[in-house]
Amino acid sequence: MTTIWSAFFTAIGKAAFKKNVKVTKVTLGKNVKTIGAKAFYGCKKLRTVVIKNTQMTGKTVGSGAFTGTYAKMTVKVPSKKLKSYKTILLKRGVSKKAVIKK
């Protein structure tokens, strides 16, 4: 498993992909409303995350969801949500070295 495309999911469960070193790219579709705590914890090879949803908040992204992922990963977010998503993602474990862009 290298790519996860979640067009039909509404949530990524708690610790769903924890320590899965085969995951390299994740695309979170518009339907994904929540990301559980430690959902991608320890996914050291996760290099790209694409977020298409515009409704995520600090309450809908669980603690440590991205802790232990590749430090210099690229995260693509909707342009109108760049600032707020950057704050949320950094609080939820995305490294400060990561590139978060629209």
Model-derived regions: residue spans:
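Short, aromatic/basic amphipathic alpha-helical patches
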Residues: 63-65, 83-97
